[in-house]
């Protein structure tokens, strides 16, 4: 593309670029909405085959509804301690699992109910924090450092 030499050239260039820029903007919006749909529909338990032709407004409304259903503590600005953060994450995961697991046909209903009950029993109230954080991964051992002046090759002498 060449640089405009006159004001008319600049106006013509803008006129030609405007539809291109609008097309790119719409493509970005549509791609983001498609990704949002793929993320939110499974969390809401909606069938993807039935919802393949959702309108953009429907996707945005479902996303807003999903975010409103989330506990407000997830979005608070104060950073919780590691134990509280772990417990909140555990509870959020359990709540999501309780919504999704019954609709899933992978497990028998009795097994699903037993699993959920077991996980609920592992949930600890805020009053008795007996649940500890999972152990941090052990650091990888560092390779031995050869003494200065020696080569990296092994020699029998």
Curated annotation (Swiss-Prot):
Region of interest: Disordered: 124-157
Motif (WRPW motif): 154-157
InterPro entries registered for this protein in UniProt: bHLH_dom, HES_HEY, HLH_DNA-bd_sf, Orange_dom
Principal subcellular localisation of the protein: nucleus
Keywords carried by this UniProt record: DNA-binding, Nucleus, Repressor, Transcription, Transcription regulation
Domain (Orange): residue spans on this chain: 86-119
Regions of compositional bias (Pro residues) in chain numbering: 132-149
Reported function: Transcriptional repressor of genes that require a bHLH protein for their transcription.
Subunit record text: Transcription repression requires formation of a complex with a corepressor protein of the Groucho/TLE family.
Designated name of the protein: Transcription factor HES-2
Organism: Mus musculus
């Amino acid at each position: 593309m060449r640089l405009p030499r006159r004001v008319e050239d600049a106006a013509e260039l803008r006129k030609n670029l405007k539809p291109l820029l609008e097309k790119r903007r719409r493509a970005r919006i549509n791609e983001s909405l498609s990704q949002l749909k793929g993320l939110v529909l499974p969390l809401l338990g909606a069938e993807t085959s039935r919802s393949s032709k959702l309108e953009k407004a429907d996707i945005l409304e479902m996303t807003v509804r999903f975010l409103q259903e989330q506990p407000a503590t997830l979005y608070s600005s104060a950073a919780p301690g590691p134990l509280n953060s772990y417990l909140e994450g555990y509870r959020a995961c359990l709540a999501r699992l309780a919504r999704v697991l019954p609709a899933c046909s992978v497990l028998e209903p009795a097994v699903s109910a037993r699993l959920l009950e077991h996980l609920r029993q592992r949930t600890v109230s805020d009053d008795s924090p007996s649940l500890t954080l999972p152990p941090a991964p052990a650091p990888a051992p560092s390779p031995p450092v050869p003494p200065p002046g020696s080569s990296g090759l092994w020699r029998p002498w």
